[in-house]
Structures are given as structure tokens and as C-alpha cells.
Amino acid sequence: MTMNELKKAFAAKLLNIKAIKLQPENPFTWASGWKSPFYCDNRKTLSYPTLRSFVKLELAHAVLEHFPEATAVAGVATGAIAQGALVADELNLPFCYVRSKPKDHGMQNLIEGTLPEGAKVVVVEDLISTGGSSLKAVDALRKAGFEVVGMVASYTYGFPIAEQAFREAGVRLVTLTDYEHVVAQARETGYIKEEDVEVLHAWRKDPAIWKK
């Protein structure tokens, strides 16, 4: 299937398991501090064996197609640990995961797992919002001496601030679906109402100041 067909198909699957939540009156607060009427809980895909396998295979396919030089996989904690491990298993590659900060006990590791020296790493992420935590993981891997060849993720909001951050960091991002495809599919199927679309449009215009 084409990339556009994949994005539409995966968007439909996310809606089917009710992974998309809309709460304009009681907005979600993200780690970045932004308020959002919209939340994509794509970790729910792990609970459905057929869908879990779909995500694993499509992410693995994305790695093979776009980053064939990868010799290892790293997941971003905590959301992408499971997805990253599944992809690494499918590709038969070494795996590690990157914490948001070092453990405060034991080995105090930031990177958990052992990769070959100089490994070419593809990073697996579950969701991209501002890109901050994802690129923090990239930075940790680079400082540890690994080459980051790119990143694959299940979903992105496609914010300009994130796209700019990825460009500046020199990281290519490939995702299975995105905000535009999910909202279009939700609108087409009646998952959201027209007034909801207006709220989402207002939020998407300037999410940093929405509801402040």
C-alpha cells in the first residue's frame, strides 16, 4: 500500500479501538505544558494482538525501506519500549531503550541495554508532539557514541515546531499516520462532529497558547 493508504488505514484502526480522545471542556495537559482537546493514546494498540502485529510489521517495514543501514534499534521510554522491542525482534537486531533521565539508584543508567560499539541506530517512538523527549533520546545515543540514522514512530501531530527541531537535529522522521489523516478519518466516519473540527482547528493554529 502507498504511504497515504497506510496513514489512512492506521488512522481508521486507531479510531476503531477508540485510541483518539476528544475533551474540549476538560483538556489534556501534555508534558510540554500545552493544553490539548485531543489525545492519541496509541499505546492501546498493544492490547490488540492483530493491531499490535500490524504496527510491528509496518514500523519494521519503514526501517527496512528508509533506514536499511540500521544495525540496532532504540526505543524511547516508556511509551515506545514495547514497540521498539517488537521491531527489533522482527528485524533480528540488538535493542536498547533510552530513559528520560538516569535512574536514581542501581547503575543509574540513561541507556538500558548493550549495543555494539559504533552501532547505526534507528530510534522507535510511539508519538511525536513537540519532539522534545524524542530528540533528547537521540542526543543521549549520540553522546554514547552511536550513530542515529533516523526515527520511526506510530503517530505525529506534525507541529511546525517539531518539524523544525527534527531538521535542526538532522534526524529524518517516518510515521505510520498523523494528525491530518486521523482528523480527516474521524470527520468522515462521524467519530467527531463539525463543531469539534472547529475547536481542533483553533487549537492546531496555536497550541502553545490555546486555553491559556
Identify the residue ranges that each predicted region occupies.
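PRPP-dependent phosphoribosyltransferase catalytic core
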Residues: T2-N16, D139-K212
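Conserved acidic residues
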Residues: T71, A119, V149
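Active-site-facing substrate-recognition patch
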Residues: M1-H66
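Short, glycine/charge-rich flexible loops or terminal/linker lids adjacent to PRPP-binding catalytic cores
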Residues: G84-V122, T130-L135
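Phosphate/pyrophosphate-binding loops at sites that engage ATP/ADP/AMP, CoA/4′-phosphopantetheine
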Residues: L59-T71, L141-A144
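Short glycine-rich phosphate-binding loop at a beta-alpha junction
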Residues: P68-A77, V152
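Solvent-exposed alpha-helices and their adjacent loops that cap or buttress functional pockets
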Residues: H66, G113-E117, A165
